[in-house]
């Protein structure tokens, strides 16, 4: 049996190492206790050093955001299943302010407001974390909005143009096509994305707030089928989620957008819709016992939307010249744009596109009321070619609306009024577009210019849209150089105008209307003078009664 030897030097060395690493200082950890938990809100006692918007950790991995910082308790918005919490549970500080992971890999994915994937396609590799409540760019960090953000919708691109870095409100009653306008705008960015040019490409973020899960799934399917999902991220806070997720979803979309903007990219963010976010924030505020104001909204609901939408900007060249274009959606009731939330957001944004249920029900889609829709950026965000042809369009349509109202009471109209009425009817038809069918700017310019020149005046009203579609197919084969010229940013030259008019007249000879006839331009005949009439050759026919 081996002899046991003990080295006193080794024992002394081990004790010395242990005692030298020992610290007499006690570690401090703040721990709170749940007083109550109900309706997505937890009241927590303790945590005297907690920060506003700090993440707190509950048992079972549930997290919350500190909101009300009272002297003896903290009001916490629970981001998860609050039913798992019970009185007496311990709550720990994390020291982190609410943030989400961001990065290029988020394109093509569906995430929740915490940046976690919910599409079943696996984890997302993030580049970094970005704070949700980030400060908007200052005045000196911005530059004027001058680059167009084409939507592919003639009525918007011509009369209420949107520029990169602008905030344009889409407002209207439910079921008037608000989401369709925004989805078409996303689809219209496909051609720019395929160029591979960073200065042309637009990354899109669609924030779905309080919508049905089936609606979000259908939208994702549409984007995927149209080839637009590869440059789009969907931030989803469906109706089944807690109010806290609906409140945070727009800020998550804005944080992801700012990450790309500061890299010099162009981003389009759609908030669908901010009415539901305001309602969720109202519910949270009332549950936190904050004093209600107008329509029971809290006093800082204006600040809720202003600090979100101010993050949309066109950055200066020194910061990379990136941009965020915001399209917030607001749902009205009975076309009442004077309600609290609509007036708030109208005052924050750079213009609004108003969709009207009456127009929608009459088949005018997109149902844009051009009378009260406006863009405060205006022609600065239009190409030269579009600015040239769209100048009189709004006036022509406004005059048509007035004349249309008058014509319902007047029995006789003079020839000029009749001509204006008929052209207005054709302009309205020309501005109607199918869903998920955005139109390139060069096609819009050619259609609007030809309409202004009277090329559609003798086309039956019911055939205007089909005539336009088939005309573009014909012009694409017979005058492709005109499309290339406009796409390059040039205005229509006199030679191009002549080419378009001649080609249109040739096409009219082949176009067949719905009733099977052809469009024939009858030559103008001058009236005969009295001396030219041969009275002796006139034949008088008399109708003889039976």
From Swiss-Prot:
A GO cellular-component term linked to this record: plasma membrane
Localization per Swiss-Prot or TrEMBL: Cell membrane
Cited Pfam families: ATP-synt_ab, ATP-synt_ab_C, ATP-synt_ab_N
EC number: 7.1.2.2
GO terms of molecular function: ADP binding; ATP binding; proton-transporting ATP synthase activity, rotational mechanism
Record's keyword annotation contains DNA repair: no
Principal subcellular localisation of the protein: membrane
Residue numbers binding ATP: 172-179
TM stretches of this protein: none
The UniProt record lists the keyword S-adenosyl-L-methionine: no
Catalytic activity: ATP + H2O + 4 H(+)(in) = ADP + phosphate + 5 H(+)(out)
Origin: domain of life: Bacteria
PROSITE patterns to which the protein is assigned, alphabetical: ATPASE_ALPHA_BETA
Protein role: Produces ATP from ADP in the presence of a proton gradient across the membrane. The alpha chain is a regulatory subunit.
NCBIfam families linked: atpA (TIGR00962), PRK13343.1 (NF009884)
Subunit relationships: F-type ATPases have 2 components, CF(1) - the catalytic core - and CF(0) - the membrane proton channel. CF(1) has five subunits: alpha(3), beta(3), gamma(1), delta(1), epsilon(1). CF(0) has three main subunits: a(1), b(2) and c(9-12). The alpha and beta chains form an alternating ring which encloses part of the gamma chain. CF(1) is attached to CF(0) by a central stalk formed by the gamma and epsilon chains, while a peripheral stalk is formed by the delta and b chains.
Family membership noted in the UniProt record: Belongs to the ATPase alpha/beta chains family.
Stated name of the protein: ATP synthase subunit alpha
Name of the gene encoding the protein in the UniProt record: atpA
């Amino acid at each position: 049996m081996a002899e046991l030897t003990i080295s006193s030097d080794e024992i002394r060395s081990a004790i010395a190492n242990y005692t030298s690493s020992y610290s007499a200082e006690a570690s401090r950890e703040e721990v709170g206790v749940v007083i109550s938990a109900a309706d997505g809100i937890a009241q927590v006692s303790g945590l005297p050093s907690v920060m506003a918007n700090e993440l707190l950790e509950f048992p079972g991995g549930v997290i919350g955001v500190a909101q009300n910082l009272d002297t003896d308790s903290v009001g916490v918005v629970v981001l998860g299943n609050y039913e798992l919490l019970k009185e007496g549970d311990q709550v720990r500080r994390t020291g982190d302010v609410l943030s989400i992971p961001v990065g290029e890999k988020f394109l093509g994915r569906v995430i929740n407001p915490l940046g976690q994937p919910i599409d079943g396609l696996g984890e997302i590799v993030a580049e970094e974390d970005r704070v949700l409540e980030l400060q908007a760019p200052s005045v000196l960090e911005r530059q004027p909005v001058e680059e167009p953000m084409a939507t592919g919708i003639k009525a918007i691109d011509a009369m209420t143009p949107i520029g990169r870095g602008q905030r344009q409100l889409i407002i209207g009653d439910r079921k008037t096509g608000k989401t369709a306008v925004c989805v078409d705008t996303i689809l219209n960015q496909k051609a720019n994305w395929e160029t591979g040019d960073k200065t042309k490409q637009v990354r899109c973020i669609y924030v779905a707030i309080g919508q049905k899960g089936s609606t979000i799934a259908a939208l994702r399917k549409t984007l995927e089928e149209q080839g637009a999902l590869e440059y789009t991220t969907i931030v989803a806070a469906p109706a089944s989620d807690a109010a806290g997720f609906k409140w945070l979803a727009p800020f998550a979309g804005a944080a992801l957008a700012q990450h790309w903007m500061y890299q010099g990219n162009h981003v389009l963010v759609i908030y669908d819709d901010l009415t539901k976010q305001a309602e969720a924030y109202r519910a949270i505020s009332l549950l936190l016992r904050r004093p209600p104001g107008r329509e029971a909204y809290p006093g800082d609901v204006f600040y809720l939307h202003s600090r979100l939408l101010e993050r949309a900007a066109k950055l200066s060249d020194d910061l990379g010249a990136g941009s965020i274009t915001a399209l917030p959606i607001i749902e009205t009731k009975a076309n009442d744009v004077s309600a609290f939330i609509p007036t708030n957001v109208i005052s924050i944004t750079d213009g609004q596109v108003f969709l009207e249920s009456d127009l929608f029900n009459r088949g005018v889609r997109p149902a844009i009321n051009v009378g009260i829709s406006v863009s405060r950026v205006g022609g600065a965000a239009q190409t030269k070619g579009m600015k040239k042809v769209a100048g009189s369009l709004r006036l022509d349509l406004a005059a048509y609306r007035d004349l249309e109202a008058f014509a319902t009471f007047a029995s006789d109209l003079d020839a000029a009024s009749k001509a204006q009425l008929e052209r207005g009817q054709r302009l309205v038809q020309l501005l109607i577009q199918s869903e998920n069918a955005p139109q390139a700017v060069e096609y819009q310019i050619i259609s609007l210019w030809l309409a202004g020149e009277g090329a559609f005046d003798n086309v039956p009203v019911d055939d205007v849209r089909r005539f336009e579609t088939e005309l573009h197919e014909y012009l694409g084969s017979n005058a492709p150089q005109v499309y290339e010229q406009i796409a390059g940013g040039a205005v229509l030259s006199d030679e191009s105008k002549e080419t378009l008019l001649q080609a249109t007249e040739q096409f009219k000879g082949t176009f067949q209307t719905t009733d099977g006839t052809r469009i024939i331009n009858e030559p103008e005949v001058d009236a005969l003078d009295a001396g030219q009439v041969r009275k002796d050759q006139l034949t008088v026919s008399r109708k003889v009664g039976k």
